[in-house]
Amino acid sequence: MKIAVTGASGLVGAALVPVLEAAGHEVVRLVRRRPASTHELEWDPQAGTIDAAGLAGAHGAVHLSGATIGRRWTAARKAEILESRVVSTRLLAETLAALDPRPSALVCAGGIGIYGDRGDEILTEESELGTGFLSDVGRAWESACEPASAAGIRVVNLRAGIVLAREDGALARLLTPFKLGLGGRVGSGKQWWSWVALDDVVAAIRFALEGDVAGPVNLVSPNPVTNAQFTKALGKAVGRPTVFPFPAVAAKAMFGEMAEEALLTGQRALPAKLLAAGFDFEYAELDLALERALAK
């Protein structure tokens, strides 16, 4: 199958593309510069331009691009986080909807922040959505896919947890202090951190492309943990104690609103739809997932 991928140079995209190619798929990457090969197509979401002709014959698309949430949220940064997702998603969805024939599937990235802070509540794809900036972003992001679904394209809205990889993301940022023996819980440590191994993210995206799941899909391990449990497991994985907690007041002073929504609160999410569809998580346990991530 011909598969179009945005964000192919990012953490997930860089891991996904070789797997799709090894499975025999033809992958075309959407890039925001002049294409360097026949396997690249140029697009500029802010300008509203995309190489629609190059997408002809695509069987599916995976949309992974979007500004990182892992920095302090200024007003300008929040606008960039929202617009980078919504504008690009709408352009891609409208373009795919106008193709003849149309692709069969659009798999779009997203996050479990869409549920907001829910304490100990167990969250599945049937749970109500929450409130807050990340929830608002998630709603708008998923809504931007509507042109594709209205055209009959099967849309999969991934709601991913913390992706475990040493190359980038939350785990990469935690590694240095933890290796120095300076790691510990964040705030109370009682907040839930739903996580997922990078290998399982890649496998789940391929599963979504080739299968028949549709709508919101929680992309998280079946075994969420609290922040205190996560930090203890990470300390064990790197062979260091975890006796230096990061107080909530310090997190708020350093990261502002981002700390409130992304560090000090969390979601206890379960991958109900993936499990019901028969997806098998290779790294369902945190210790095994951390061992795999740190061995790469």
Where are these regions (language model features)?
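Alpha-helical substrate-binding/gating segment
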Residues: 175-183, 191-224
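C-terminal amphipathic/interface module of NAD(P)-dependent oxidoreductases
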Residues: 260-296
